[in-house]
């Protein structure tokens, strides 16, 4: 026997035995693995409103998703006590092995308390609005329609730092769709072509402009009279009293003047036609009405007879006020603070500047020639 042939056959590889059958190939290929189910596959619309409740308090989106998965809703959390909230958070940690951040524990309680305060404030406002609608007055009955909602300076609460990016990434698409639908619904046509804003199409209905009316006269058509304008200041005073009573009950700082807090309260109470720009714009006209009603009525009649617009009447209201200040030592702030209905309003900057300029003019002219200067209107 040839030894070389023996060694050749010993080390000869049978490659055919190593090739598996095609059917075996198919059996050996593992089936495609399904992607693991997302641990937090709760979409924003399935969070039962928890995303709006928690988003500004630094609570992670996945934490809210786990709370919703346990079956909790906003109404359920609002009706729970602090001890029950602690039990809920402990259950969340034990069942899902989910580590809650310290800030999240405080944030959940803070969000629930803030929502309770908001709901508590809205209930008396609605009741007061319903009761206030029954009171009749002789103001512009035909001009109470079509009020606008103008911007009021609001102090936006800073959102918490934890988990905000996750919230935005998950819920941004849903919010865009909802905001787009709301904007489409809010677009209305401005029916008053000669309004102060002049836009043909806007996102909110504009309030009908004011016209100069005599005392007791009711404006007709799409206009508001001056009696109605002065009535808005009385409403602001009522809203300030309500804000003060709420602040006293809570032990918070009590405002003494009409501030942004009062305008926000009026807006939430449904009186969106009361806003800071408009009320500050005509506050000196209301001051003349309070300090010298006869002079205010005479000025209204004169401008009504001449057919002047409300802008010219507004400018003319400065001069009688400066004359009143000249008779009381030019201290316009003391004049406002001494009057019960004006003490809650800030003195307009232009009125203070006019009093200051006229005082300097009167002082300089009296020292030189003894004659008074003219008001720079």
From Swiss-Prot:
Disulfide bonds: none annotated. In developing inflorescences, leaf primordia and very young leaves. Residues 116-190 are annotated as: Disordered. The keyword Nucleus applies. Residues 206-210, 275-282, 346-349 bind DNA. It is found in: Nucleus. Keywords: Activator, Developmental protein, DNA-binding, Nucleus, Transcription, Transcription regulation. Pfam families: C_LFY_FLO (PF17538), SAM_LFY (PF01698). GO terms for molecular function: DNA binding. Residues 131-141 have a biased composition (Polar residues). This is Floricaula/leafy homolog. It comes from Populus trichocarpa.
